[in-house]
Amino acid sequence: MLWGPDNYLDIEDLRVPRITRTIEDGEDLVFGDHTVHVILAPGHTPGCLNYSFEVHDNGQAHRVIMVGGYGVFGPGIYPGKHEYPHSVTYAVDQALTFATSCVKTWEYCKENHCDVYLNPHPHLCAMLETDEKNKARKPGEENAFVIGLEGVRKWIVER
């Protein structure tokens, strides 16, 4: 993330990747036999994306929703002592956009029966704790990441 001439993490040799294509809302990205559905879901930045894909456990299919960029930034000082460059009005607009993204994501989850919630930030979905539960899993026990549609709704509401 760049803030004008500075960069968010104060990396001396920041190399910005070259954009080779853009991804559209609702696009399916195909990787061999695997398909990842893309959902535009503005949150802390306008380009935030959610992803959905199928996984299998013990021969049973499950639908994952991977939510990225949830939350909003308000005015203040952030890591690296950078001041957030926008006003309270911007933060309110951002919060309304974020709320719309939450509703859109939930509607997708209901329609597609998502039963696994992931987040690219492990602490925002108890990923490490859930993985520990799975390590102790006995044959025939449900995968701890499979939380059902209501469990997915809870994570979306709490984020």
Give residue ranges: language-model regions.
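Metallo-beta-lactamase
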Residues: 1-40, 45-46, 68, 74, ...
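Accessory terminal helices/loops
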Residues: 58, 73-159
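Extended hydrophobic secondary-structure segments that form protein cores and membrane-embedded regions
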Residues: 65-69, 117-118
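Active-site beta-strand-loop-beta-strand hairpin of nuclease catalytic cores
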Residues: 57-65
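Histidine-centered divalent metal-coordination motifs
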Residues: 44, 48, 121-123
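Active-site beta-strand termini and strand-to-loop segments that position acidic
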Residues: 31-32, 53-57
